[in-house]
């Protein structure tokens, strides 16, 4: 019993330290790097010179930019042209806010252009990390390759994923995930952030504790994946963990 109590105490200490490290990362100047690139470089250059650089694309009227990430050969980031910190923002459950996940899915074309040939949809994944699972304080969706082991696990669970948010059998990467199947027409009409907030009990009040990902399945449907922060299990809700920025799946 004493050993069990000690182990529990150690886990709590580790969780508190992890939370503290996450907070420290988000309070430094470097946490504003992406926001400065968008607002001080990409957007002004597009508006003044019709040149999106250093971004790959700037769409002021649509409210987003696409930027090549330095990590990995094919990873891109989709970001808003205005201030949104992350998943905790109430703007993401406002119907007037752009459907950033759908826009990010269109942004996968940049991966193919960079690769020099079409990147199969089955190799692509989108992910956004929770408030404690990110290092930047500007909303950004990672557009990158999926890990081969995650791809295989989702393929094997195709029949078990329904149109309701349900626990994914076995979770992913050692963490619990909710999974929901959506059609392309559903995705076009409704943001995954709204689906999560409106369909998962108490999610709306705790959106910042969730990481969210999206993957296409072999039947052309999409799977939404949501993981919630749980520091006792060392889960910071970094949905980016399902991605492989080195793109082994293409080799």
Curated annotation (Swiss-Prot):
Q: In which pathway does it act?
A: Phospholipid metabolism; CDP-diacylglycerol degradation; phosphatidate from CDP-diacylglycerol: step 1/1
Catalytic activity entry: a CDP-1,2-diacyl-sn-glycerol + H2O = a 1,2-diacyl-sn-glycero-3-phosphate + CMP + 2 H(+)
The EC class name is hydrolase
Report any one BP term from Gene Ontology: phospholipid biosynthetic process
Q: Does the keyword Ribonucleoprotein apply?
A: no
EC annotation from Swiss-Prot or TrEMBL: 3.6.1.26
Q: GO CC terms on record?
A: plasma membrane
The record ties this protein, via InterPro entries, to: CDP-diacylglyc_Pase, CDP-diacylglyc_Pase_proteobac, HIT-like_sf
Highest rank taxon of the organism:
Bacteria
Record HAMAP family: Cdh (MF_00319)
State the family named in the UniProt similarity comment for this chain.
Belongs to the Cdh family.
The UniProt entry, under NCBIfam families, shows: cdh, PRK05471.1-5, PRK05471.1-6
Name listed for the protein in its UniProt record: CDP-diacylglycerol pyrophosphatase
Gene name tied to this protein:
cdh
């Amino acid at each position: 019993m004493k050993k069990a109590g000690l182990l529990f105490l150690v886990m709590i200490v580790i969780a508190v330290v992890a939370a503290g490290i996450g907070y420290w990362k988000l309070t430094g100047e470097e946490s504003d790097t992406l926001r400065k690139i968008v607002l001080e470089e990409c957007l002004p250059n597009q508006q003044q010179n019709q040149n999106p650089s250093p971004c790959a694309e700037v769409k002021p009227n649509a409210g987003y930019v696409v930027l090549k990430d330095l990590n990995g050969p094919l990873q891109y980031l989709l970001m808003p042209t205005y201030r949104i910190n992350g998943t905790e923002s109430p703007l993401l459950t406002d119907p007037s806010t752009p459907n950033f996940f759908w826009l990010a899915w269109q942004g996968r074309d940049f991966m193919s252009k960079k690769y020099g040939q079409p990147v199969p949809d089955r190799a692509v994944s989108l992910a956004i990390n929770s408030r404690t699972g990110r290092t930047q304080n500007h909303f950004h969706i990672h557009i990158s390759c999926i890990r081969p082991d995650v791809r295989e696990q989702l393929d094997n669970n195709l029949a078990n994923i329904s149109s309701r948010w349900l626990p994914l059998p076995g979770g992913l990467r050692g963490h619990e995930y909710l999974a929901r199947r959506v059609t392309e027409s559903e995705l076009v009409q409704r943001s995954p952030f709204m689906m999560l907030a409106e369909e998962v009990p108490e999610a709306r009040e705790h959106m910042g504790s969730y990481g969210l990902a999206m993957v296409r399945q072999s039947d052309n449907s999409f799977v939404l994946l949501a993981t919630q922060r749980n520091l006792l299990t060392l889960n910071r809700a970094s949905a980016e963990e399902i991605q492989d920025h080195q793109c082994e799946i293409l080799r």
